[in-house]
Amino acid sequence: MKKLLVFVMLLVATIAESQAQEHIDALLNGDIESNRYGLTMRSAVKRDPATGKIIKRVVELTASDDKSLAKEFIAAFKLDRNTAEAWDENEGGTIYNVTAVWLNPKRVYTLATNGSMITVIAQTIYREEKNNNN
C-alpha cells in the first residue's frame, strides 16, 4: 500500500510539473501570425563551451498595436498562476505586469503590457553557470 501511495504522489507531482506554464508556452511555441503588426520574436541559447549542453534559453516576444495578443497572454499567465512557485503581479488601468517563477528547471517568465504594447520574456535556466573567477 505504501508503494502505491508513493507512486501516486510521484505521478501527481510529475503531472503538475509538466503542466506548469503550459498555456504561456502554447502561445510562445504556437504559430503566432508573423504578419501581425509590430511583432518581433527573438531567441537565444547559452551553452557550456566544454560540454555543449544548454545552460540557459531566453525567448523574447514584443508586439505593438496588438490588444488581442496582449489579452491572450494575460489570460495565459492567469491560467498558469496556480502552478507557479512565485508570482508578482501589478495591474492598473491599461498596465499589467507579472513575473512568474517555476523551479526544476528554473523558469522565469515576465509579461509587461501597456494597452496594445506587449513584451514577454521567457527564461529557462537548466543549470547555474560556474563562476571561473576563482
Enumerate the language-model features and the residues they cover:
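Mature extracytoplasmic domains of secretory-pathway proteins
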Residues: 49-96
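Bacterial Sec-dependent N-terminal signal peptides
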Residues: 1-24
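Flexible, processing/modification-adjacent segments and terminal tails
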Residues: 22-34, 131-134
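Surface-exposed, polar helix/loop patches in the mature regions of secreted/periplasmic/lumenal proteins
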Residues: 81-134
